[in-house]
């Protein structure tokens, strides 16, 4: 049985880790910490958990002695500092601290300088692309939610060289839980309900993460124009991507089917069928659809994920399964909740 710790257990990604790990047949939660709610029972914070375990302060020695792997679900800059105290434990970080190859890029976009950053010690945790590296990693930087939806949707097209990469336009819609569990006016009911708005236009922190990984896939520089929008729903991301191509829709669709054949969580939809966030709700599944705008030679790709599962906690557990040589789908077999 894998002994698991969750640092930052009371945020939305933390509680999603708890929900998924409680039904994982090969994992046991032995440690949970919360800076805000230390000393309280989990069920005092989330009554739905029925969990009597008491949340603790961060204790590096206790984690090192009692855990085989720790999930860190913390603000930018915090995970890296705490992870440096945990030298004998596998770490899966759901924040941004271990996603970047170049610490200067991270510092530029997140405003935090990571001292003594060793990019060779960490692996970018997108299983469909890097499972062989993840298997032997000690530290995994779990991808961001938007990058997950965009990278998976673009990878087959970029790898096959059938699209232009100088300008890729991405329009994404996300549920409010993507902003985290915090008291902010912009995310109150009256501000969000019956409202749709863009945010962080042309300056979202996920852009350099997308470009870093897409460059590796394409083998050359990739530029992404990214506009995220907040929509009045709890979970889900729908990304619509526009990219130029000379290939036929049938050829592109065949490339995608072949690339993702055998992947347990990525589903390429039949032509004429387009994804819905409702199909992913509460699950680790990804749905990808496509259409060709023939007048302009524009390939329109669409992907849907649950931002808290495949976009965060579910993908983190998928990475854990790989790191411990388990079946990749273990603990993640649940179908989406519908309706």
Curated annotation (Swiss-Prot):
Q: Where is the active site?
A: 145
Q: Does the keyword Chaperone apply?
A: no
Main location group: cytoplasm
Q: Which GO terms describe its biological process?
A: L-arginine biosynthetic process
Q: Which reaction does it catalyse?
A: N-acetyl-L-glutamate 5-semialdehyde + phosphate + NADP(+) = N-acetyl-L-glutamyl 5-phosphate + NADPH + H(+)
Mention any Pfam family matching this sequence. Answer: Semialdhyde_dhC_1
What are the UniProt keywords, alphabetically? Amino-acid biosynthesis, Arginine biosynthesis, Cytoplasm, NADP, Oxidoreductase
Please give an example of a GO cellular component term from this record. cytoplasm
Q: Which SUPFAM superfamilies match?
A: Glyceraldehyde-3-phosphate dehydrogenase-like, C-terminal domain, NAD(P)-binding Rossmann-fold domains
Determine the domain of life of the protein's source: Bacteria
Its subcellular locations are:
Cytoplasm
Pathway of this protein?
Answer: Amino-acid biosynthesis; L-arginine biosynthesis; N(2)-acetyl-L-ornithine from L-glutamate: step 3/4
Q: Does the keyword Cell division apply?
A: no
What is the role of this chain?
A: Catalyzes the NADPH-dependent reduction of N-acetyl-5-glutamyl phosphate to yield N-acetyl-L-glutamate 5-semialdehyde.
The similarity annotation says: Belongs to the NAGSA dehydrogenase family. Type 1 subfamily.
- UniProt cross-references to HAMAP family, sorted A to Z: ArgC_type1
Q: What is this protein called?
A: N-acetyl-gamma-glutamyl-phosphate reductase
Q: Which species is this UniProt entry from?
A: Thermotoga neapolitana (strain ATCC 49049 / DSM 4359 / NBRC 107923 / NS-E)
> From which lineage does this chain's organism come?
Bacteria, Thermotogati, Thermotogota, Thermotogae, Thermotogales
């Amino acid at each position: 049985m894998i002994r698991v710790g969750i640092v930052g257990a009371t945020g939305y990604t933390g509680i999603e880790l708890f929900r998924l790990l409680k039904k994982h047949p090969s994992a046991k939660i032995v440690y949970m910490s919360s800076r805000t709610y230390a000393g309280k029972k989990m069920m005092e914070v989330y009554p739905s958990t029925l969990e009597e375990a008491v949340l603790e302060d961060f204790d590096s020695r206790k984690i090192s002695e009692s855990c085989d792997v720790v999930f860190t679900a913390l603000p930018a800059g915090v995970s890296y500092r705490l992870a440096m105290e945990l030298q004998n434990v596998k770490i899966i970080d759901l924040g941004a601290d271990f996603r970047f190859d170049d610490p200067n890029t991270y510092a530029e976009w997140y405003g935090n300088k990571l001292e003594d950053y060793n990019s060779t010690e960490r692996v970018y945790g997108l299983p469909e692309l890097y499972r062989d590296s993840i298997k032997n990693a000690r530290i995994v930087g779990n991808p961001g939610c938007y990058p997950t939806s965009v990278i998976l949707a673009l990878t087959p097209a970029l790898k096959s060289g059938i699209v232009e990469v100088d300008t890729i336009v991405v329009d994404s819609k996300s549920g409010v839980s993507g902003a985290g569990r915090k008291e902010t006016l912009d995310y109150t009911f009256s501000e969000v309900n019956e409202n749709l708005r863009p945010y962080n236009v042309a300056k979202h922190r996920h852009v350099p993460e997308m470009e870093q990984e897409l460059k590796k896939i394409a083998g050359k520089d990739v530029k992404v124009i990214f506009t995220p929008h907040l929509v009045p729903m709890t979970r889900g991301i729908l990304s619509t991507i526009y990219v130029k191509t000379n290939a036929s829709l049938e050829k592109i669709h065949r490339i995608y089917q072949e690339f993702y054949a055998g992947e347990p969580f990525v589903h390429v939809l039949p032509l004429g069928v387009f994804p819905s966030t409702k199909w992913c709700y509460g699950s680790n599944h990804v749905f990808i659809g496509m259409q060709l705008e023939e007048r302009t030679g524009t390939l329109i790709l669409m992907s849907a994920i649950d931002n808290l599962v495949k976009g965060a906690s579910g993908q983190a557990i998928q990475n854990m399964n790989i790191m411990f040589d388990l079946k990749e789908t273990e603990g993640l077999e649940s179908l989406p909740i519908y309706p």
